[in-house]
């Protein structure tokens, strides 16, 4: 994986963490982004080194998800199984799906397959079970919905 791809992968992971924090604590966007810039991205915390991330890409994902939350949640909800709601999803999974859906909607420069693959990898960082497959199927379906030609 080249350096640009690695820094974008790190940005995606950090964005999911930031979105999770926002969901849990309602941290204001400017404060949230500042905290990640200053204390997370590229930092060493409890002997774990956070990779250098593509900071503008991180910012775009976090700000974009929060600015377009209703549109993103509608796209996700449209592909959930009958009887499922956003509220039923694990908060980490919500953050993963929201970030991935934002990229599918707003980042036409990133191929659908790359978005899906990257967020499946993020899901694998947080979950051991079927969740990665769930993220794969949902993001693939959303990609087909939003990138129709």
Curated annotation (Swiss-Prot):
Keyword annotations from UniProtKB, A to Z: RNA-binding, Transcription, Transcription antitermination, Transcription regulation
GO molecular function per UniProt: RNA binding
Gene Ontology CC annotations of this record: cytosol
Pfam family, any one: NusB
GO BP terms in the entry: DNA-templated transcription termination; transcription antitermination
Keyword tRNA-binding: no
Alphabetized NCBIfam families for the sequence: nusB
Function: Involved in transcription antitermination. Required for transcription of ribosomal RNA (rRNA) genes. Binds specifically to the boxA antiterminator sequence of the ribosomal RNA (rrn) operons.
Family recorded in the similarity comment: Belongs to the NusB family.
Protein name: Transcription antitermination protein NusB
Native source species: Sphingopyxis alaskensis (strain DSM 13593 / LMG 18877 / RB2256)
